[in-house]
């Protein structure tokens, strides 16, 4: 969400999940060492077939190379564009020194298209400070706004969100959103919300 620059993204916080698969079976998803992953592939079930399929595809060097080439750079913190298949390549058994394989990293961004989440255990973070300040610089051009993002990100922000003219115009005549525009001055091309 909006505070992911401080706390990370959901896929990094999934400890375990209880999910309903397409055949009606229930699967427990949690971190698996390479040997536990292998045991999952030997199960005669849809869950076993899922792990077999993942192993078959991601063990293929050409596929892994293509994923690493075509997917967004992992250094880009918020790169939520589709399924995070590339994150699985950094886990055991695909990387010997990788963290335990957790299919939850993939399921977290799938919006229910791969399995229905019944229960989820997340790693919690400390609460944010009691008081916060929001700075909202206004810009005459989208380019100026975008050029300020990298310099402001060196500061320990909790939130850095851009709103461009398109979004701002959508709120202008919306009765529900009009009152939320109290901080917008004039007709900026863009603004940054910095907490």
Residue ranges and their predicted role:
Residues 108-109, 150-154:
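Short, intrinsically disordered, mixed-charge
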